[in-house]
């Protein structure tokens, strides 16, 4: 079965039996449930819901079903067309809408699509809100509008420009310094909306560029997750010379990775680290990332006199913690930069503009900038379990076992994370598969993998 229902929305592959995949019936059900939740929450007096989508092949079909359903629920639809996730988030607040639906499966392959649900602040629903939507959908507890109260449909394609204008207006985005640096970059926008909005951003910043996979066809030229194993094309292009750096985004442009001028990966974990270092040098303060992100952010934060706090995995958890500790910047180690001066959402446009500002100020090569940060390596493993395994009980045992050791700090807000003086390991159960994900970090990849495998054996011995 490839239909996954979660607190953040619904996702699945297109085509196949009803109930097993993302099909029009389920799209109607969950869109109706979301509209019912928004109406009952009473958080906004607006009767408008924003809809934006990435360039996936199925996007037009899904968008039509979503928009028709919202109108059937009595909501006016503001369709902003092909738009990034952060653009859609901003459109909610800029238009004063009651909420928004983003049609994107993020980094998943071309056959996938999804509905991501926003509140009136343009932020993802909390776990409690998401569960409420799931409950409404399960009961099919919704009423449609009568013929005199159907919603209206409007299109507005100005939000890309408004998004870019908001980025250029940020105090720490030094447009003049970037223009004077005369950067030339190569961009892989993986045949989606990055190919629509990033040329406009780079033009505004005076950056020369070459695009790979720039046509927003939705027919992805390679696996769309911005990991080194998928980026051979742009890495080879950088190795030819003539570029200052490479820029890679995922299909909905909330994840961002850089490539050094020599064709080597900057490291997706270091996207946030590098941007945070620049922001903290100008506006000292606190930072937040999730438990599975690199320790380098903590090091950089403490260097600037701030305090680092870890949050549970998931954007809504990170933004909630950022508000709690008044963080000046935060995000996730997968290349997600959250800068509250812009908005509380991962935004690759903000990340690009801040990174280029930093590079222009420092006057160094991207590889030299990368070498200035603490060097850590993250290993990723998984423990396959039987469906009958009590994962929670195993994690409790791990917590109790290592909680007795004085040189280990145990965190259990999201699985179990064990922080050692010079390394860490994080065990998280999957919500969709009988597995435990094991993330570990150390000063070498060998040490990181060794630590991860050690904890894997501990878990196997407990079964």
Model-derived features with residue positions:
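An N-terminal, well-structured beta->alpha segment
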Residues: 1-68, 72-73, 152-185
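Gly/Ser/Thr-enriched, mixed-charge loops and adjacent short helices
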Residues: 13, 113-239
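N-terminal small/polar loop signature for handling phosphorylated ligands or for N-terminal nucleophile
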Residues: 36, 48-112, 200-259
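Short glycine-centered, acidic/aromatic-flanked micro-motifs in structured strand/loop junctions
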Residues: 52-53, 187-189, 260, 341, ...
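Glycine-rich phosphate-binding loop
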Residues: 97-112, 238-260, 265, 308-310, ...
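Proline/glycine-rich low-complexity loops and linkers
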Residues: 131-165, 260-333, 337-338
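Phosphate-binding and adjacent anionic-ligand microenvironments
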Residues: 283-463
């Amino acid at each position: 079965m490839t239909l996954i229902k979660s607190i953040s929305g619904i996702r699945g592959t297109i085509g196949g039996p009803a109930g097993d995949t993302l099909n029009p019936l389920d799209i109607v059900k969950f869109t109706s449930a979301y509209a019912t939740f928004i109406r009952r929450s009473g958080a906004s007096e607006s009767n408008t819901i924003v809809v934006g989508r990435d360039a996936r092949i199925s996007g037009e079909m899904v968008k039509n079903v979503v928009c028709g359903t919202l109108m059937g629920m009595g909501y006016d639809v503001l369709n902003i067309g092909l738009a990034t996730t952060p653009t859609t988030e901003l459109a909610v607040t800029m238009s004063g809408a009651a909420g928004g639906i983003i049609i994107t499966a993020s980094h998943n392959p071309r056959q996938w699509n999804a509905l991501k649900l926003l509140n009136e602040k343009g932020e993802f629903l909390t776990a409690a809100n998401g569960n409420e939507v799931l409950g409404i959908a399960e009961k099919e507890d919704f009423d449609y509008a009568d013929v005199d109260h159907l919603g209206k449909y409007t299109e507005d394609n100005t939000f890309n420009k408004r998004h870019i204008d908001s980025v250029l207006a940020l105090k720490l985005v030094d447009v003049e310094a970037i223009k004077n640096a005369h950067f030339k970059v190569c961009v892989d926008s993986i045949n989606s909306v990055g190919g629509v909005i990033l040329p406009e951003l780079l033009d505004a910043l005076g950056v020369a560029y070459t695009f790979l996979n720039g046509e927003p066809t939705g027919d992805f030229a390679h696996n769309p997750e911005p990991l080194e194993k998928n980026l051979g094309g742009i890495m080879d292009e950088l190795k030819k010379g003539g570029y200052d750096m490479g820029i890679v985004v995922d299909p909905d442009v909330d994840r961002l990775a850089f490539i050094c001028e020599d064709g080597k990966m900057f490291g997706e974990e270091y996207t946030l680290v590098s941007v945070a270092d620049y922001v903290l040098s100008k506006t000292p303060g606190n930072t937040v990332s999730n438990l599975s992100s690199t320790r380098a952010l903590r090091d950089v934060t403490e260097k600037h006199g701030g305090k680092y706090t870890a949050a549970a995995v998931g954007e809504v958890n990170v933004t909630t913690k950022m508000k709690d500790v008044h963080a000046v910047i935060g995000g996730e180690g997968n290349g997600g930069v959250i800068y509250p001066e812009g908005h509380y959402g991962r935004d690759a446009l903000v990340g690009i503009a801040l990174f280029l500002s930093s590079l222009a100020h420092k006057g160094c090569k991207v590889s030299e900038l990368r070498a200035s940060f603490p060097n850590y390596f993250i290993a990723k493993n998984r423990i396959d379990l039987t469906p009958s395994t009590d994962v929670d009980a195993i994690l409790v045992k791990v917590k109790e076992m290592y909680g007795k050791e004085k040189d280990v700090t145990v965190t259990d807000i999201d699985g179990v994370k064990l922080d050692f003086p010079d390394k860490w390991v994080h065990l998280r159960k999957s919500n969709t598969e009988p597995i435990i994900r094991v993330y570990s970090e150390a000063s070498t990849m060998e040490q990181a993998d060794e630590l991860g495998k050690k904890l894997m054996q501990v878990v196997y011995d407990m079964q």
